[in-house]
């Protein structure tokens, strides 16, 4: 599912992630534990395509984050500890906004929103 090969991310003259390799197979659960500045968030953001990295390769289900970032973003999500939500939008408006960014068609969008609204027992559409 997730394969990281020799990941290196540098900020200025500081290596935030230095030659990290990791393979997480389907069904496995991993946690990133470490002190502030250890590279946990940088690694996760790199996996999600939010941050560019200098060296290495990240594959999501065999798809390269560098070569096909949108395909990878469709399979993986990142929820930050301080999400930047738009206070002027409802939840449904925000989901439609994100669907617009990723060019999700109207039919698929409605199906997905309904599916997850039902799953989480939320009011929908």
Feature names for model-found ranges:
Residues 14-15, 70:
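Short coil-to-beta microelement around the adenine-binding A-loop and adjacent beta1/P-loop entry
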Residues 48:
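Helix-to-loop junction immediately C-terminal to a conserved catalytic motif
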Residues 56-67, 71-72, 76:
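Conserved ABC transporter NBD signature motif
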Residues 96, 100, 107-125:
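Conserved ABC ATPase "signature" region
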């Amino acid at each position: 599912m997730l394969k990281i090969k020799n990941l290196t991310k540098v900020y200025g003259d500081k290596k935030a992630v230095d030659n990290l390799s990791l393979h997480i197979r389907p069904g496995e659960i991993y946690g990133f534990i470490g002190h502030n500045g250890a590279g946990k968030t940088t690694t996760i953001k790199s996996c999600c395509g939010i941050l560019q990295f200098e060296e290495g390769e990240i594959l999501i289900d065999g798809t390269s984050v560098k070569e096909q970032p949108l395909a990878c973003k469709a399979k993986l999500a990142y929820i930050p500890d301080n999400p930047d939500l738009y206070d002027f939008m409802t939840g449904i408006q925000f989901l439609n906004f994100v669907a617009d960014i990723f060019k999700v068609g109207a039919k698929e969008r409605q199906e997905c929103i309904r599916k997850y609204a039902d799953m989480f027992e939320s009011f929908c559409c």
